């Protein structure tokens, strides 16, 4: 059962999902620390290239099915124009200032 984005527990993660689904690059980038990093399927990736390819140029969209770890871990159906839909897991490191310094995703 899908969790409505507005009901996600962690404010930074909620804003992340909202920005992805709205295809709002500026809002997305404002959620990240200047030195933010990410990994996909266990491999570190270039953040700028990855978000362009996997989210913004391919119309990425997240439907969250479950959250854990205080809202900083998600199980979601992620879809984009490149890969179609897949079950994915997401983990977030949120700093004291509320910005995301690291996120990881991969197939669930």
PLM feature spans:
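Short, low-complexity N-terminal intrinsically disordered segments enriched in polar/charged residues
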Residues: 1-22, 30, 34
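Hydrophobic pocket/interface hotspot
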Residues: 16, 27-29, 36, 47, ...
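Alpha-helix boundary/capping and short turn/kink residues
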Residues: 22-25, 41, 83
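Short histidine/acidic/glycine/proline-rich micro-motifs that form metal-
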Residues: 35-38, 79
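Surface-exposed, charged secondary-structure patches
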Residues: 44, 48-96, 104
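A short acidic/small-residue loop/turn micro-motif
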Residues: 107-108
């Amino acid at each position: 059962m899908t969790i409505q984005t507005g009901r996600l527990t962690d404010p930074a993660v909620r804003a992340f999902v909202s920005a992805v689904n709205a295809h709002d690059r500026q809002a997305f980038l404002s959620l990240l620390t200047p030195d933010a990093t990410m990994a996909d399927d266990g491999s570190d990736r270039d953040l700028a290239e990855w978000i362009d390819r996997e989210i913004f140029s391919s119309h990425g969209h997240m439907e969250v099915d479950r959250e854990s770890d205080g809202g900083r871990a998600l199980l979601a159906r992620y879809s984009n124009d490149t890969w179609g839909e897949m079950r994915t897991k997401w983990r977030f490191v949120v700093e004291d200032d509320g910005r995301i310094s690291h996120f990881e995703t991969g197939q669930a």
